[in-house]
Amino acid sequence: MDVIRIHRLELDCIVGIRPPEREHQQRVRLDLGLHADVSPAARSGRISLTADYDQVAHEVAALLSFRRYHLIEMAAEEVAAMLLGIHASVQRVDVRIEKPGALAGRARAASVEVKRKRRDFPSSVERLPYGEREVLLETREARLELLRIDPEQELYELPDSSSEALCWLLSGAASGEQGSLSARLPEGASHFSSDCPNRLRSLGPDPALLFRCWRRNLTSH
């Protein structure tokens, strides 16, 4: 199997269990390996037939910036689930997260590495009036899911004060209270929207497909 690799992606995010770590961002480094057959893209020159590593980097940055993790183990698990859910051509994901400041003065870094295949994340699909919701992964702190809004249908959910949502459009077209959603994360942006609309309407003849992460507002760990 071919592998697309991203080496030493550097991000600043909230990660850790100690009080200072909950208040201030710290640097983490990631190595990613996406196992997929790249021959269709290699022969056609079409980036849509492979995993665009620039977009992958933005997606990972968006999730880590938004999530406020307690453990890098959970961060690695969620990154793997997200990438496998979003990128249909990817069959396995390797995620290594390094935390340089974890053992300051004692070691160069602490790290965790996970290797996940599709079968490691048995998803559940629920049919809803607007389309479908596929839960990619649910943890104590968050839920990662794909939303499919059928043509000319509208998703509406009541605001939930116990959680916040990050979302972006993967394909199709959709609009929310603040206008149309982007099908790509803006270049250089840490995340697309930390205020995911409660009302979304599919536009055009094709379904709108979105990724969404719900972050639960936990009072204690």
PLM features per residue range, with description:
Residues 207-212:
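C-terminal interaction-tip segments
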Residues 1-137, 142-147, 151, 168-171, ...:
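N-terminal, polar/charged subdomain of small-to-medium soluble alpha/beta proteins
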Residues 153-157:
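Short, charged beta-strand/loop "edge" motif centered at a coil->beta-strand transition
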Residues 178-198:
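Short acidic-glycine-tyrosine-enriched beta hairpin
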Residues 198-205:
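Asparagine-centered strand-capping/turn motif at beta-strand->loop junctions
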